[in-house]
Amino acid sequence: GAIYGNYNIGVIITEGKMTQQWHGEIEGCYWASDSQLYQLTRPVIGVDREGKAGAYWVGVPQQGTFYYYDRPQTNVVGQAKYPAVTATTPADAIDWNPYFAISCGPMVLYDGKAAADNSMVDDKHYYTNYECWDESGVYSAHPDRSAVGITEDGKIVLFICDGRIDESQGAYIKELGPIMKSIGCVHAMNLDGGGSTGM
């Protein structure tokens, strides 16, 4: 999924079993300038046992308990803290049983609409950074990008964008949603980019 320092901050589901899970709180800033803990939801994309694809946000109120939602917990770094995720917060939990799934983020396209942009709440925090990503590395940079998407007919699309050659200078997060939509996706999630894109 995704890492924060030396520990996992996402979920991975393999053959119906949660093989990686985190407790759903994280500090508001990777570099300790905001040590407040925020209850998070993370985007997750996967398929059920029949191969039907799904895209949701996953919340983990405590180890061993997790819920899927059709919207994120709308935290904004530096703003009011939202309550812990529950079976009804930030929305009623979705009954989804993925057979294979991975979380990363941010979600860049959901129901055909861009889910991340560069609008700011102040001079340093992005309004759509509900998942409290490192803003300097994820939002304001344009490195190599990797993404996974779902088309309207349920196909899974894997996408990479090189950012280290003259012909391609990577992509900003705000550009990734429209790119994924242009190749037929209705949902899309950013994966780890940079050097990971070369794998």
Residue map of PLM features:
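Gly/Ser/Thr/Pro-rich low-complexity, intrinsically disordered segments
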Residues: 1-199
